[in-house]
Amino acid sequence: MASGYLCLVLHWHLPFVRHPEHPRFLEEDWLFEAISETYIPLLSVFERLEAQGIPFRLTISVSPTLAEMLRDGFLQERYLAHLDRLIELAGREVRRTRDDLAINRLAVMYLERFTTCRTLFVDKYERNLLKGLIHFQRSGNLDLITSSATHCFLPLFQVVPQAVKAQIQVAVRSHIRTFDSYPKGFWLPECGYYPGVEEFCRQYDLDYFFVESHGVLYADKRPKYGVYAPIYCPNRVAAFARDPETAKAVWSSEGGYPGDPVYREFYRDIGFDLPTDDLKEFLPGGELRSNTGIKYHAITGPGERKRVYNPKAAEKRVHEHAEHFVSARIEQVRRVAGFMDRPALVVCPFDAELFGHWWFEGPQWLESLLRKTAARRDELAMITPGEYLQRWPELQTSQPCFSSWGNKGYAEVWLEGSNDWVYRHLHQQALRMSELARRFPKEKGIRRRALNQAFREMLLAQASDWPFIMKMGTTVPYAVRRTREHIHNFTRIYDSLMTNSLDQEWLFSVESKNKLFPEIDYQSYVA
């Protein structure tokens, strides 16, 4: 038995963005960047480890909205068009930078990366990256779990519990259809927990979820093992707490690994550095500057002046940081061993997009970490929450407290002056959806389609991504537009059903655009 265990959890999520009404849409690039920079690199890490017989165990939560986009043929085609543009742009960069050896080497690196992404996407994964996840689930390397249907921040919907239930119910059904397996765990979006949400988890046979550290540390009974073991809620659904030491080492913008000066600078991209005329063919609309993924500079320091990125120096630092992380975790579990009657558990949940997208070297670091952990598994072994609960089923029972991993630890990010206006509409929608389901209990044909689409629009409006963007001040007009659009669509369907004036042509256009959750059933909303 190992001295301690490491539970590594990667959360794969993006909001549902799909715009067939436009030939190209900037926000669809969120998905395309994540595929090229995070999802394919992570799957490649798993492929190399498997090929070399190196054991690894991870938990990956896949949000239903992301799964729907990854399987969507329309978005798969658009991703290939996106890649083809990048391959052409990288080829031009190789020619443009031929007189600058250091920059030219990087241009060649990007050309090779984009070309490899295309080959893997088409030939290996047959355009569907979910196949890669399913393979590693069946091999026993990954434990796949789900999250709420549209990544709703559940604590702000406890006043309409039918909405919380619907988010979890639709998520579980979507996961079964996607992965042909039942999820045993649940990722609370933003680790947003409120007392009582575990009742819906138990209703759908979800055995565990994750919370921020203080969700367990401030539970109604002081946790005997702190964050080093899960606790049971009163209904025996387990809550696993995020370890604050590892969160600081990896997440911190000041002292965390991703901020090292030799690593690649995220915010210097040729999409902003080169003259617009040189990029017209590659920018949305020919003039809207955006990230291309081609970046030539290292973080260097806080100032404007940046050194040219050196991949070899970065690779060396990756292994140093992986060694530091593993050694620190071994020391950590040894430090608390005297206070425990079981091996300490260190829970490390992360947004997957940190690895590769925000932190370019993240997949390399993860691979090095997994290799080093495998080599020292007598001291620190990988484990999934399900395995932990099988080995140590007797846990302390306590009631976690309201918490999230957002700024200041509660709900301030998703409920404040920039976004508080949405909730009166979202709560009213949830109540009106109940009204529709009761008033039209056994509809068929076009009315049933309308009711199911109303259900979809309600769920899409509840996504936590939109209030988050409003708070952070990034693509605010888009987040506001999406929220209003789904509220409008729902309201129009509601009004038309109440007045028997359904516009079929309009309904078909909305179904075609917001095309997800084909198994959705409005009748289940009040079941």
Regions found by a protein language model. Give the residues of each.
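Short, solvent-exposed turn/loop segments enriched in Gly/Ser/Thr/Pro and often Arg
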Residues: 61-66, 148-150, 185-194, 214, ...
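Conserved short loop/turn motifs at secondary-structure junctions
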Residues: 183-193, 351-355, 475
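Active-site and substrate-binding clefts of carbohydrate-active enzymes
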Residues: 2-57, 62-108, 112, 221-527
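CE4/NodB-like, metal-dependent polysaccharide N-deacetylase domain
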Residues: 163-188, 328-349
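Acidic (Asp/Glu)-rich catalytic clusters
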Residues: 2, 47-55, 128-146, 176, ...
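His/Asp/Glu-enriched short active-site or ligand-binding loop at hydrolase and phosphoryl-transfer sites
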Residues: 153, 207-219, 383-384
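Hydrophobic, small-residue-rich alpha-helical packing segments that form membrane-like cores
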Residues: 192, 197-206, 222
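Glycine-rich phosphate-binding "P-loop"
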Residues: 148-170
